[in-house]
């Protein structure tokens, strides 16, 4: 019996806890059901050392499980109290039955996802349904009894407690080369479900991966992850007692019920929107303030998620202006809870929810993690987002000049798909491997008329991200071959040279366009056209990101030696590009280059980053915490904790017990 619960080939979280893992990709069921971070199936984490760090990680995991259990029970109690208070006067005869149903559904919340679905009536629960919920509650209680045990100690076959034995080293997650086509994403897609209704086609996985499925422009196909994909989407117990109708996407007007909501809406449109989507004014953008407001009026989840983000952003700015005012997640937790509840209702709805609002909600939740990094798990949101965009990405067809104008829904959908693609690619810098959809992204970017344009989201052309994906894949190849003892320096250099030659050609071409654009602006004598100004800014962002990509490529090939001529030259060029940016609005979107270049510059050049991030950009929301991360990197290299020859940006994946988002 003991051997059935031991995991030698599962995710690292289950292996640490000695629990059986179903090895679901990209995240296993066990971790999602319990609300734990799944550390995946790649290379052995640094903390898995069979020593102090491993014990500390196990203790941290145990503490988190205990806290989750405590929070869940507190919510159950509050939910029952709220329901009792909110019952109408003529329902006193069915009161006990309502409370029983709430408790039963709550007890099964973390284990039986189907029990999360709201019944049509609460007073008519059958005995079979009640027994089922009680069974789920008993099963959940059994798991809780298991997880409170010390995760560092497990019972072997003999039943006696034993410490962790040696764990078989797992190779990194396989990222196929271009010749393998879409097969590399098989592991990530094989468990997906797809919602459907009258206006939605029901694709099968084989047709998606082989490219045989036809996607008409008027047909929306939404790929929805498995129920166990993300524990954050589990319906909270308080949902049963909500005072608002939970009909998913609504066609009604914005339900502004009080002055606070009206002020948050005004603040979002005035401050947050332009910060969140700084390049919406470009011709290629498919989103505007009016379009976003229209989307909010049709989608209650997006409306609530946007208000939660607006509330957090407003408090963040207030805390910066007034030292006595502190930014506390608890002050906004209620808004985020309700937003997630509504999001979950759309996610689990029998009708396919509006995919535009779902994508927009995910982008808003990920953006919120920049403010509440220790409370909002962006990795969970991103996994949900990539599962939603997978059918669109794998089946995307190049646009043609004769393509008809897109509807507002189509333009907005493409914009938010591009947003998730951008986040997925940039955030991989300090993760274990390249994005699972890397080869699909590359195919999109090669098109002369790509369906998804990333410049509309972050001001950076697709060719930069295509080069970055090549560098990521080279990094993964180097890790895999080195672990197998098969690394060929000649082959590594050859692959890197191919990438570098193509990248340098595009950098030179962009520099030419940058200079021409700058001359045109100067000829307009201080009153440039908005379109010309936007185009110039895009060339600036292109150059900055591309120079940072060249730095990353050099580090992968030669190591992170700041004094090495190749690294020094590439870092110096990137630093010059960063120095030329004076506009704080543009600096907000170059966090990724600041991180990459800042990690490998010489000691005498570190002052630029300290001065910028503690001076001009000290109040930045997007760059908050970046200086602390760089200081940690510099200190770890000075102390010898991290060696230059094996420097990997994944060393900086976690900071202050949170997974750092770089974008």
Curated annotation (Swiss-Prot):
Keywords: DNA-binding, Metal-binding, Nucleus, Transcription, Transcription regulation, Zinc. Residues 71-97 are annotated as: Disordered. One of its GO terms (biological process) is positive regulation of transcription by RNA polymerase II. The keyword Membrane does not apply. GO terms for cellular component: nucleus. Residues 11-38 bind DNA. The keyword DNA-binding applies. It is found in: Nucleus. One of its GO terms (molecular function) is transcription cis-regulatory region binding. Transcription factor; part of the gene cluster that mediates the biosynthesis of the meroterpenoids arthripenoids. Belongs to the TRI10 transcription regulator family. This is Transcription factor atnD. It comes from Arthrinium sp. The gene is atnD.
């Amino acid at each position: 019996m003991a051997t059935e619960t031991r995991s030698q080939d599962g995710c690292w979280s289950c292996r640490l806890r000695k629990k059986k893992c179903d090895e679901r990709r990209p995240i296993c069921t066990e971790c999602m059901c319990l609300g734990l971070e799944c550390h995946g199936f790649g290379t052995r984490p640094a903390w898995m050392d069979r020593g102090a760090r491993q014990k500390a990680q196990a203790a941290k995991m145990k503490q988190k499980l205990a806290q989750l259990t405590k929070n869940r029970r507190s919510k159950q109690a509050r939910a029952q109290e709220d329901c009792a208070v909110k019952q109408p006067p003529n329902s006193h005869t069915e009161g006990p039955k309502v409370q029983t149903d709430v408790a039963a559904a709550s007890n099964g919340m973390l284990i039986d996802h189907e029990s999360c679905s709201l019944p049509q009536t609460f007073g008519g629960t059958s005995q079979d349904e009640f027994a089922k919920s009680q069974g789920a509650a008993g099963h959940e209680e059994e798991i809780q009894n298991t997880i409170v045990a010390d995760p560092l100690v497990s019972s072997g076959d003999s039943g006696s407690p034993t410490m962790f034995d040696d764990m078989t080293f797992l190779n990194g997650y396989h990222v196929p080369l271009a010749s393998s086509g879409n097969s590399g994403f098989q592991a990530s897609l094989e468990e997906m479900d797809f919602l459907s209704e009258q206006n939605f086609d029901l694709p099968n996985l084989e047709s998606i991966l082989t490219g045989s499925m036809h996607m008409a422009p008027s047909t929306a196909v939404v790929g929805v992850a498995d129920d166990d994909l993300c524990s954050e989407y589990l319906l909270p117990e308080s949902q049963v007692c909500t005072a608002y109708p939970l009909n998913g996407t609504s066609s009604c007007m914005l339900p502004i019920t009080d002055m606070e909501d009206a002020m948050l809406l005004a603040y979002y449109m005035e401050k947050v929107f332009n910060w969140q989507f700084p390049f919406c004014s470009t011709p290629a953008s498919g989103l505007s303030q009016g379009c976003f407001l229209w989307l909010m009026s049709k989608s209650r989840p997006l409306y609530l998620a946007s208000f939660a983000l607006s509330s957090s952003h407003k408090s963040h700015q207030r805390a910066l202006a007034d030292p006595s005012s502190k930014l506390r997640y608890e002050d906004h937790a209620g808004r985020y809870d309700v937003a997630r509840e509504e999001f979950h209702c759309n996610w689990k709805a029998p009708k396919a929810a509006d995919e535009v609002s779902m994508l927009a909600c995910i982008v808003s939740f990920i953006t919120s993690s920049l403010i509440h990094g220790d409370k909002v798990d962006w990795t969970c949101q991103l996994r949900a987002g990539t599962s939603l965009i997978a059918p669109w990405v794998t089946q995307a067809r190049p646009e043609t000049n004769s393509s008809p104008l897109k509807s507002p829904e189509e333009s907005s959908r493409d914009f938010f798909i591009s947003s998730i693609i951008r986040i997925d690619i940039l955030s991989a810098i300090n993760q274990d491997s390249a994005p699972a959809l890397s080869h699909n992204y590359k195919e999109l970017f090669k098109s002369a008329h790509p369906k998804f344009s990333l410049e509309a989201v972050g001001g950076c052309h697709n060719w930069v991200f295509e080069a970055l994906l090549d560098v990521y894949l080279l990094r993964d190849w180097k890790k895999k071959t080195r672990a197998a003892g098969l690394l060929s320096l000649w082959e590594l250099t050859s692959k890197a040279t191919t990438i570098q030659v193509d990248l340098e050609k595009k950098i030179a071409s962009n520099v030419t366009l940058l200079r021409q654009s700058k001359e045109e602006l100067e000829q307009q004598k201080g009153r440039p056209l908005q379109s010309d100004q936007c185009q110039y800014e895009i060339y600036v962002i292109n150059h900055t990101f591309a120079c940072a990509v060249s730095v990353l490529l050099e580090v992968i090939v030669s190591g992170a030696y700041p004094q090495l001529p190749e690294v020094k030259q590439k870092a110096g060029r990137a630093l010059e590009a960063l120095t030329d940016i004076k506009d704080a609005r543009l600096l907000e979107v170059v966090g990724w280059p600041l991180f990459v270049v800042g990690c490998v510059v010489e000691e005498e050049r570190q002052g630029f980053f300290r001065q910028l991030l503690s001076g001009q950009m000290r109040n930045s929301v997007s760059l908050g915490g970046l200086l602390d991360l760089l200081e940690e990197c510099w200190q770890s290299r000075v102390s010898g904790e991290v060696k230059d020859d094996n420097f990997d940006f994944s060393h900086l994946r976690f900071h202050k017990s949170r997974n750092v988002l770089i974008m």
